[in-house]
Amino acid sequence: VYKRQIIYLSPRGRLLNYELSKSIAESNCNYILICGHYEGIDERIIEKYNVEEISIGDYVLTGGELASQVLCDSIIRLIPGAIDEGSLVEESHTNNLLEYPQYTKPDNFCGMVVPEILKSGNHEKIKEYRKQESIRITKKYRPDLLNNK
């Protein structure tokens, strides 16, 4: 039996993060998303139906439609079979670390080259390099994530 939960996308709601998306994706629940426009929705709806409020960040949008798309995308990708399971393991926020840098072709772009280790074929060394790069990137851009371990 499925239970039902109503979610209102609101700037005053609980901040959406990986853990919240994961718990929603793993729940045995049907969700109804409410998207306000301009001033929001009637407060009595929130009170009467025990509505959970979720925010996608500390800013205000004209309506909740874009926020609901962000919420849906963050949940759907965590549902088994939606994307390759191996892809989820190394993604940003999975272990409170941001993802390592990505490189594409050409090998040399404006004098900047792909690190040699990534072209070496040594999977163990590549794995270690990516882990160290994830730590470096997280320290640089989101050191707060390292304190949440």
Where are the language model's segments positioned?
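Loop/turn-to-beta-strand initiation segments
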Residues: 28-32
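Short beta-strand segments
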Residues: 7-10, 33-35
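Short glycine-cluster motifs
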Residues: 18-23
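SAM-dependent methyltransferases
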Residues: 106-149
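Short glycine-rich anion-binding loops that position phosphate/pyrophosphate groups of nucleotides
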Residues: 11-14, 37-39
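Short, small-residue-biased leader/transition segments that mark boundaries at the very start
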Residues: 1-2
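Internal, active-site/partner-interface "lid" segment
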Residues: 66, 78-116
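Structured adenosyl-cofactor binding patch, chiefly the S-adenosyl-L-methionine
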Residues: 41, 45-91
